Amino acid sequence: MLEYTAGLIRRNKKKFLISSGIIGVGYYVTKTINNKIQEFQNRIREENFAKEQIKRRFHQTQSDCYMTFLSLLPVLCEPIMDDLPVETITKQLQIRRLEKQIGNKDVKNSGSTVLSDDFSTSQEGAISEDTNKPPELKSKNQLWQELKIKAITRFLTLIYCESLLIVFLHLQLNILSRKSYLETAIRLASETQGIDLVDQESNGDFSGNTQDENLSEQAFLSFSWWLLNKGWLEIKNKIEPCVEQHFGGINPRQQLKINEFAELLNKCQNCIDLKVLNLTEDDIHLGVGVIEDQSQPVGRKSTNFITNALLPPKEFEFFLLQQTNDLDFLSRFNNNIVNTESLNMLLDELNNYLNNADINLIVNKLATLGITKVLDEIVLNLLQKNRPNPISDMNIRDIDLNDFPPYKLAALLANITKQSISLTNNSVENPILADLNNLPELNDLSASVYSNFDP
């Protein structure tokens, strides 16, 4: 049996060798292919996981932007409300009406009745006046003129300042979130693949040993202080002349249809867009704007108005940090020059985004959306008083505003004042603010900033 087997092997030795070689090669090829498939599957899983992580972080960052905006809203609105004290003027007009009624009950209040009950109730819960200061002795006509201008100026100032704050925070937080994610991803790659980060660290890109990253990032976030304390006033001073131009000659007793009032607001907005955003009507319709020179000189001085309203001049940057941080922070920040360099890099990137024409267009879209939503609310409020059946904002677009009766400007001002107060409400459920935050163009801007991994 053994001799037979040995003979069989000798006779078929070549065939056995070829078969063994084929089997060995087949096994090796199969194993190699399986390994490659496994590596490919692992790489796909890692890429999908990375994409999910990026998406999750992106959505979390957008949520953080909105919550930060809501937390800063009272700080933004308080000085605007104080500087444009519509409620104080209303109180003075109410006092004048009471004095006239008490002085002569038989005289009809033909002029004083312009101050409607709607205007009185719209002030409930608003900022109270300073009772220690006696009211200025102004005529009733002067008070009405002042009330008219300040009510509309306050409304438009709130809309534009809130729009700018939303854009500013989305730029800030997406820049920081992208930077944090990129550094984390590269550090993980260095641990798993042995990438040397010494060169990057020496250049200040990854600063675990040379600086506390939180210092430059905290300093960067402090720059919203400029709009909250200085920039809003510049914006208000641009808006008020536009309101004077288009509403100054209208008597509060004059009756206007809703679409006429909306057209006046639209003219004001066009004037503001030209002065604040450097946008004409044609620019807005075409979706283009003036592009600033991206190579800014030392000090980041810009001819773009909103950039100057959002960021301080170079010489005021340390003053800003002093206003927003304690001495311990300032001492630690100044101890390392890398902190200043890192902050300057962040500010330069932010400045470049702000000088992009797309930013002005996005601010315009936010302001337009806010004004439209407020007008919708005014229409609903007026409809509810005239119709027994409730009307939702879902079918408001089906209503022909030309069918509306005219209203006294005073009544429309009362509604504007009421809606202005609602714009100061920093509740998560505030529908107008939520709509502003969900503007598609704003989300596109955030995505472009977050995904910009160019050095």
UniProtKB/Swiss-Prot annotation:
Keyword line:
Membrane, Peroxisome, Peroxisome biogenesis, Transmembrane, Transmembrane helix
Q: Where are the transmembrane segments?
A: 155-171
Spell out the subcellular localization from the entry: Peroxisome membrane
Deletion phenotype, per the entry, is:
Leads to a peroxisomal-deficient phenotype and mislocalization in the cytosol of peroxisomal matrix proteins. Affects the assembly of the peroxisomal translocation complex and impairs the interaction between the peroxisomal docking complex and the peroxisomal translocation complex.
Q: Cellular component terms, GO, for this chain's entry?
A: peroxisomal membrane
One biological process term from GO is: protein import into peroxisome membrane
The entry lists its GO molecular-function terms as: protein-macromolecule adaptor activity
What induces this one?
Expression is induced in the presence of oleic acid or methanol.
Check the record and name the InterPro entries matching this protein.
Answer: Peroxin-3
Q: List, as start-end ranges, the regions of compositional bias called Polar residues.
A: 113-125
Q: Main localisation, per the record?
A: membrane
Where is the region Disordered? 113-135
How is this protein positioned relative to the membrane?
Answer: Single-pass membrane protein
The entry's function note states: Peroxisomal membrane protein required for peroxisome biosynthesis. Shared component of both the peroxisomal docking complex and the peroxisomal translocation complex. The two types of peroxisomal matrix targeting signals, PTS1 and PTS2, are first recognized in the cytosol by their receptors PEX5 and PEX7, respectively, which then carry the cargo to the peroxisomal membrane. The peroxisomal targeting signal (PTS) receptor-cargo complexes interact with peroxisomal membrane protein (PMP) components of the docking complex.
Quaternary organization: Component of the peroxisomal docking complex, composed of at least PEX3, PEX13, PEX14 and PEX17. Component of the peroxisomal translocation complex, composed of at least PEX3, PEX2, PEX10 and PEX12. Interacts with PEX19. Interacts with the pexophagy receptor ATG30.
Please give the family membership noted in the entry: Belongs to the peroxin-3 family.
Q: What's the protein here called? A: Peroxisomal membrane protein PEX3
Query: Could you tell me the gene encoding this protein?
Result: PEX3
